[in-house]
Curated annotation (Swiss-Prot):
HAMAP family: Meth_synth. One of its GO terms (biological process) is methylation. The gene is metE. It catalyses: 5-methyltetrahydropteroyltri-L-glutamate + L-homocysteine = tetrahydropteroyltri-L-glutamate + L-methionine. The lineage of its organism: Bacteria, Pseudomonadati, Pseudomonadota, Gammaproteobacteria, Lysobacterales. This is 5-methyltetrahydropteroyltriglutamate--homocysteine methyltransferase. 5-methyltetrahydropteroyltri-L-glutamate binds at R16, E17, L18, K19, K116, R520, C521, W566, E610.
Length: 758
């Protein structure tokens, strides 16, 4: 019999039950007992769903109240000193303080740093370690959840983040080498594995996703040392698990490690199958990741079946398990909830539950069960319908793409000439001031949008409300003395969804939520077909806003790469091609904004860096088409029209050439928290265009002092010519309150005025 297994199931619940339970607890409305009750209910439901769907060996310890990397740090007592007293007195409060920070009862703790989980849209909390770090088992979460499932009659495979990946995903606060801590960490892992075996666990899944990265010799040696140590003494069987790409030059290393099974991603790394089968040690299980755990399209089951049959033919049926390519954390729970989705598009999709069903079909087909043929036929029909659908393929888009030339991506003249033309048109002072785009979305704004969407507020009344909010925002900016204004974006819910709702080729689910971090869930758009802009998207609001003021008004757009990165993207063509389609739609919007009298247009690209492939050797190709897409969107304007972009990264050194190649007239970046250190990359590179280094952190309600901003600007002025500098906050102001926004912007304008006066 062919075994079906799973690496991890979404935690949040089909209707975001975990989100609601967490936020209720954080508001003090429910206690820890009630929160844990909801967590147990979700785990039980998810284990049962997996068994009912045909999963032979579901995972346990894949559930988390916030983040699995934080769980690992907490489990091994890697708790920074500032949280220690709270964690000892109240473990759950300490855990959430590490995740979210805490300001209560005289305690003021900031949270751990958060960053992207590899190249996904999930965020993990970065453990803080130090040279003298001590590790010890704290609690028994993996064992407790294994036994919890066992009490329900379900045998699971506990999931652990592996020791080397745990250290590589952490940071040291004292500059010491993370891998030097491996020797102290390994005895704790060994102890945990021994306890899991004593509890009855036959298999443990040990995730080492860093095996798909570029690894130096020291890191490769750390893997050998770690797994030699874990192989000493009693332990369950280990399934060494890689995902998010092929093992590549780490394949030999992975096969040298003493594990009993190996999971490989055959969606992103189909080409590695032969190499794995040629060198897999005899008797070792191969877990074949055949179903895409990161996207929402039905699997081409015939193709997957061919790979699975080939693998079974090479190493035997008993040694090939079927699995998703990676955790199902990255997809929504259940397509069956989407009752109102376009029927054709719905038939092309598979969410977490459906992906497990696909694996069961594959297993049944491999076991020659006749019922599999019906499902295989349905899949073939769905895939063929998608291939032939006029909803997917628009001839006019193909024609536009074919007509692209190098000139399509070029401005009329170089930046020095353009900047002179723009200054003559805009007549801006030195150190011009602006904001990044959004202004506070108050409770009134959110309630009005909700009432409009539910039909309780008419379109005309909603428009009247939005116009009033927009005018109030503009008058406030004029009173503060900002030089280039924005309209506030009160009509927008989300910087991708707002545009996606107005573009053909995008579709939105009602309950297609995935976890971004903690209780924050996002509902990514689905790009199912060729992207076309049927009508202008932002021109009406930008033109209205410009009519209210004599100062320049920025048109605000989300860039093509960001729209791509934050969506579920069609898998029937290259991502680069889809990105160019979005860029062409934005190109039309940019042209219409210019025709409507908008002289400054900002195209935000916060996601260019996070789209970088995991292997550095693949960066150049990605950056080439990412830059090309931005330039397709932004290059069809007169010299007098000023193109801005905004980026919020913690590192620019390794992509600075690509950032310069965008050829935006002005780039605003997030620099206040690094005290302008991020500017070093621009200085070393001699970045030629204008830069707006953020002078205050919008993620905090704190209003900085004028002197702080002046010092930051002087620091910037010391390394960049004054004529290159703009003055702006770090990011958009959507999540802030009006009181602190007004005060902070007023202070920012005063700081700019002081520098002008010098």
């Amino acid at each position: 019999m062919t075994i079906v297994t799973n690496l991890s199931f979404p935690r949040i619940g089909a209707r975001r039950e975990l989100k609601r339970a967490l936020e209720s607890h954080w508001r003090g409305e429910t206690d820890a007992t009630q929160l844990q009750h909801t967590a147990r209910e979700l785990r039980a439901r998810h284990w049962q769903l997996q068994r009912d769907t045909g999963v032979d060996l579901p995972p346990s310890n894949d559930f988390s109240l916030y983040d699995h990397v934080l769980d690992t740090a907490f489990l091994f007592d890697a708790i920074p000193q500032r949280y220690r007293a709270l964690a000892d007195a109240d473990p759950l409060a300490g855990y959430f303080a590490m995740a979210r920070g805490r300001q209560a009862d005289g305690i003021d703790l900031h949270a751990l740093e958060m960053t992207k989980w590899f190249d996904t849209n999930y965020h993990y909390l970065v453990p803080e370690l130090h040279r003298d770090q001590h590790f010890a088992l704290r609690g028994n979460k993996p064992i407790a959840e294994f036994e919890e499932a066992l009490a329900l009659g379900i045998t699971t495979r506990p999931v652990l983040l592996g020791p080397v990946s745990f250290l590589l995903l952490s940071k040291t606060v004292d500059g010491s080498n993370r891998l030097d801590l491996l020797e102290r960490l390994l005895p704790v892992y060994t102890q945990l594995l021994r306890q899991l075996q004593a509890s009855g666990a036959e298999w443990v899944q040990i995730d080492e996703p860093t095996l798909v990265l570029d690894l130096d010799a020291q890191t490769q040696q750390a893997f050998r040392k770690a797994y030699a140590a874990l192989n000493q003494g009693p332990r369950p069987k280990l399934l060494l698990t890689s995902y998010f790409g092929p093992l590549g030059d780490n394949l030999e290393l992975a096969l040298q490690l003493p594990a009993d099974g190996l999971h490989i991603d055959l969606v992103r790394g189909t080409e590695q199958l032969d190499a794995v089968l040629n060198t897999l040690p005899a008797g070792r299980v191969l877990s074949a990741g055949l179903v895409n755990g990161r996207n929402i399209w039905r699997t081409a089951l015939d193709n997957a079946l061919t790979l699975a049959r080939y693998a079974q033919g090479r190493i035997g049926k008993d040694h090939v398990w079927l699995a998703p390519s990676c955790s199902l954390l990255h997809v929504p729970v259940d397509l069956e909830q989407e009752k109102n989705l376009d029927a054709d598009v719905r038939n092309w999709l598979a969410f977490a539950k459906q992906k497990l069903s696909e694996l069961r079909v594959l297993a049944d087909a491999l076991d020659n069960k006749p019922e599999a043929e019906t499902a295989l036929t349905q899949t073939r029909q769905a895939l063929e319908a998608r291939r032939q659908s006029p909803k997917v393929h628009r001839p006019e888009v193909a024609q536009r793409l074919a007509a692209l030339t190098p000139d399509t991506t070029q401005r009329n003249t170089a930046y020095p000439q353009r900047s002179q033309a723009q200054q003559q048109t805009l007549n801006l002072p030195a150190y011009p001031t602006t904001t990044i785009g959004s202004f506070p979305q108050t409770l009134e704004v959110r309630e009005a949008r909700a009432q409009f969407k539910s039909g309780k507020l008419s379109e005309s009344d909603y428009e009247t409300f939005l116009k009033a909010e927009t005018e109030r925002c503009i008058r406030t900016q004029e009173e503060i003395g900002l030089d280039v204004l924005v309209h506030g974006e009160f009509e927008r819910n989300d910087m991708v969804e707002y545009f996606g709702e107005q573009l053909d080729g995008f579709i939105f689910t009602k309950l297609g939520w995935v976890q971004s971090y903690g209780s924050r869930c996002v509902k990514p758009p689905i790009i199912y077909g060729d992207v076309v802009r049927p009508a202008p998207m932002t021109v009406t609001w930008s033109a209205y806003a410009q009519s209210l003021t004599d100062k320049p008004m920025k048109g605000m757009l989300t860039g093509p790469v960001t729209m791509l990165q934050w969506s579920f993207v069609r898998d029937d063509q290259e991502r680069a091609q889809t990105c160019r389609q979005i860029a062409l739609a934005l190109r039309d919007e940019v042209q219409d904004l210019e025709k409507a009298g908008i002289k400054v247009i900002q195209i935000d690209e916060p996601a260019i860096r996070e789209g970088l492939p995991l292997r550095r050797g693949e960066w150049a190709d990605y950056l080439n088409w990412a830059v090309e897409s931005f330039r397709i969107a932004s290059s069809n304007v007169r010299d007098t029209t000023q193109i801005h972009t905004h980026m919020c990264y913690s590192e620019f050194n390794d992509i600075i050439e690509a950032v310069a190649a965008l050829d935006a007239d002005v780039i605003s970046i997030e620099t206040s928290r690094s005290r302008m250190e991020l500017l070093d990359a621009f200085v070393k590179f001699r970045y030629p265009n204008a830069i707006g280094p953020g002078v205050y952190d919008i993620h905090s309600p704190r209003v900085p002092q004028e002197e702080e901003m002046v010092l930051l600007l002087k620091k910037a002025r010391a390394v960049l010519p004054p004529e290159q500098l703009w003055v702006n906050p770090d990011c958009g102001l959507k999540t802030r309150g009006w009181k602190e926004t007004r005060a902070a912007l007023q202070t920012m304008v005063h700081a700019a005025q002081r520098l002008r006066a010098e």
